[in-house]
Amino acid sequence: MKKVVPDFTVFPVGIDETSVEEEDPVRFAVQAAVLKARAAAERHPAALIVAADTVVAAGSRILGKPDDRDEASRMLHLLSGREHRVITGVALFRQSENRLLTGWELTHVTFRQLSSELIDSYLDRMDFMDKAGSYAIQDVGGEFVESIRGDYDNVVGFPTGKIRRLIHLFERPTLLLKADRPAFPAAGARAAESGRRYYLCPAVAGDTVRVQVIRERRRIVETETIEIVEPSPDRVTPRCPHFGQCGGCLFQDLSYPRQLDLKTNHLRRELEKSGLKGLSPEIIEPVIASPAIFEYRNKMEFAFGGQGRTLRLGLRERAGRIPFRRTVGLKTCPIFGQTFEKVAPLILDFARDGRLEVHDPETGEGTLRHLVIREGKTTGQVMVILVTAEEDIAGLTEAALSLKKALPALAGFYQLVTRRQADVVTFEKTKLVFGLPYIEEKLERLTFRIRPPTFFQTNTLAAERLYGRIRDRIAAEKGARVLGLYCGAGVLETFVSSSAAAVTGVDSLPENIASACENAAINGIDRAAFIAGRVEKVPAELSGSFDFVIVDPPRAGLSPKALNQVLKLGVSELIYVSCNPASLGRDLAAATTAGYRIMSIMPFDFFPHTPHLETLVFLEK
């Protein structure tokens, strides 16, 4: 500590580290340091308390101080011949000002292959008892250590450089700033003061906030809000009790009309970045509001987190400074609805009773990955999909039947098995455990069947409005022939078929084509045909001409080959549906270069309280 400040007092505090319910090693170390700092501040409320806690992490496993020689031996054998992380959490706290600043240091250490004799010889010296990971770098040196990547002082247990920087930030006076513009599409707001730019979070544009600086970058100073001194007129009270932690929503604290304004401005900026400058105001309509701003989602992918008594089900936390996204346990999810509140407790009880553990993608251990819930917002039917890394789970059928008793709307229960490392839901192997293989959803009078992998717009009521605009445009041309590319389950093509003489849908996945044909059949549609094939190839093979081409591509937009195929068709009217303003702008720029004129751009808010939007564009040639 003398490397940091000349005058200080050292005194130990005792905390119960078992009370720290964090599975991430970085968060564990930081939270333990915070507990130490707060405990010390009870005795010295006016002093600047500097507390630290060091852990060793092998993968996601946290290694603290060993209880005895046997545990120390197991730790060292685990670390032998592999890389591990030494993490020190740091907390600076002054109780009289209620100011807290945290940080951490991380160093990668690689051990040589350690023999049992070498480990026993070290343990005989009894230097391991109060050491995280059962060793001290100054005691084992090159005998154990092959390489160190990062701060050596951190491995010793006190990262002097990090602490010096944190003290410098802490001793700076707090700032009173007026948030003058939003940080959209990110959460928070921005401010300018004395020639410097600041990022404020949490904050909304119009807030006056007191902040402390937590990080200085070349272009912007990152701050943390201590107090909202004067709230913005656009600030509202979030409905969700988990808002601010959960990453599912970013803007529940912002009035809905203001959210729509931000999305309109964001869309215009993204289009201008693509070279589409000078678009008249009447071409880009204001964002069309969602019919419902809560309970609008018909599908949610929830994640498991924790272990044992801390097992939880929810959403990944909002991205922050710590490079790990834990699962925030949810009791409710207002953007989805009350079905989650009925399903989640029963699934968690089943998992705890069966002692099922959460899957760790780094080690491959554990079973539980995600829980997907799909709900027909117009029919009330519910599908539950338990995503696991292992196939054989005892009692799963009984659990599904119990869930049916508690939730009569449950139409089907699936198990999805995926062993991919990526933390996403991928449909590799599905097994129907109970009930029907699909649920049904309605758009106006049309019925659509939804299976586990089926793409269906997340906001049912907003989709009706967007699809209705397309149908009305097609209806203005008598006897129109329509080509739908990236048709998925044929929902849009079936919806607009009543206004066309013939509709052809194209999609690369055969299972999507099968669903599209089924949806057309159950609605008695005989003017729609569907073809399996890649958009980059199929249009050139189709006979006849089309009056309209509808493209509804994935987030990345049209590939160069697909774009070339679409432009080669030379149809008089092109309709583009996009969920990504950046790729939309790129493709629209190419279309205008090829001779198309943008007639109207209509953004729809399919995702209230998030930065996302859906955009419908009509082009003519």
What function would you assign to each model-found segment?
Residues 53, 391-621:
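Rossmann-like S-adenosyl-L-methionine
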Residues 173-242, 278, 320, 529, ...:
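Terminal RNA-binding accessory module
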Residues 373, 379-389, 447-451:
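Short, aliphatic-rich beta-strand segments
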